Amino acid sequence: MRRKDFFEFKQFTIDQRNAAMKVGTDSDLLGALAAGGTHILDIGTGTGVISLMLAQRCPDATIIAVEIDDHAIIDAAANFAASAWADRLTLVHASFQDFFAAQQAEGTLGAFDCVVCN
């Protein structure tokens, strides 16, 4: 196991063995500085690190995380399942355009008080 395969935070660990984009300063800062809220959309979640940071920080939040990449979605799914906040995290394997169109067609597109994209 290579050291860069995992990234450890205080309350969770990120498995990033499959994702091309590894956790970096940009995701750490965005996750720390994002306003948060109760209905959060994470576009291009990658490993799910920002969604997890927001779930940890915002105990009343429900988070929808959208990811198109076949490899990153594997890591995000594992990271969400291993977290204490799995019941508040929804992972969608789709492009943002397809996610948006499906939500619109189903009449389920809701309002979000925080949208993050890294």
Where do the language-model regions lie?
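Alpha-helical structural elements
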Residues: 1-2, 107
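SAM-dependent Rossmann-like transferase core, predominantly class I methyltransferases
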Residues: 2-39, 45-57
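Conserved SAM/SAH cofactor-binding pocket of Class I
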Residues: 32-117
